[in-house]
From Swiss-Prot:
Gene Ontology terms describing biological process: protein transport
CDD domains the record matches: Rab11_like
Organism: Arabidopsis thaliana (Mouse-ear cress)
Membrane topology listed for this record: Lipid-anchor
Annotated TM spans: none
Gene: RABA1F
Span(s) of short sequence motif Effector region: 42-50
Matches recorded under Pfam families: Ras (PF00071)
Lipidation (S-geranylgeranyl cysteine): C214, C215
Record lineage: Eukaryota, Viridiplantae, Streptophyta, Embryophyta, Tracheophyta
Example GO molecular function: GTP binding
Protein's UniProt name: Ras-related protein RABA1f
Length: 217
């Protein structure tokens, strides 16, 4: 039980959702970040799945509760409960399948319809290790991210490329917005109740953060 107690020591709890077409590698991104595991035999997720991991941002412990779409995206059955309370999202496409890139606009609309307008979004081009099969250029994806005012990275869950960076960037940006908002109203950010749904502030707060931008390495 000690391990469970240790895992509960955190200053913030942020809910982050993974969205995107089936087969783009969402579950492997989740397992790579939370358990440093990758499965070549990965089957479509069935049933609700989420995992947690805590990271340090400044001198605070930020715990991420990361939700996987559980295969429901194949049936267009993702419910509003999946999105409820999310303050961050990774919108994933497969760089080798152009149709998954074409569908991100629909995913983004659904995400924004069901979440706070200021949610921190990372646009993720996964399977970047399959260079010889690339069907979506980095430039096209960057242009989309800039147009939609989101962050962007290309990742490889297989090679563990940028997976850590993508998740930690989202969590760090959420933390910065929440911290700045707390300072503006004179609150101690650490005093916010654990598990509270975090309102990530006014539109100006997040657009100012997002202008910093982020791109693939």
């Amino acid at each position: 039980m000690a391990a469970y107690r240790a895992d509960d020591e955190y200053d913030y709890l942020f809910k982050v959702v993974l969205i995107g077409d089936s087969g783009v590698g969402k579950s492997n991104l989740l397992s790579r970040f939370t358990r440093n595991e990758f499965s070549l035999e990965s089957k479509s997720t069935i049933g609700v799945e989420f995992a947690t991991r805590s990271i340090h941002v400044d001198d605070k412990i930020v715990k991420a509760q990361i939700w996987d779409t559980a295969g429901q995206e194949r049936y267009r059955a993702i419910t509003s409960a999946y999105y409820r309370g999310a303050v961050g999202a990774l919108l994933v496409y497969d760089v080798t399948r152009h149709v998954t890139f074409e569908n991100v606009e629909r995913w983004l609309k659904e995400l924004r319809d069901h979440t706070d307008a200021n949610i921190v979004i990372m646009f993720v081009g996964n399977k970047a290790d399959l260079r010889h099969l690339r069907a979506v250029s980095t430039e096209d994806a960057k242009a989309f991210a800039e147009r939609e005012n989101t962050f962007f990275m290309e990742t490889s869950a297989l090679e563990s490329m940028n997976v850590e960076n993508a998740f930690t960037e989202v969590l760090s940006q959420i933390y910065r917005v929440v911290s700045r908002k707390a300072l503006d109203i004179g609150d101690d950010p650490a005093a916010l109740p654990k598990g509270q749904t975090i309102n990530v502030g006014s539109k100006d707060d997040v657009s100012a953060v997002k202008k910093v931008g982020c791109c693939s390495n």
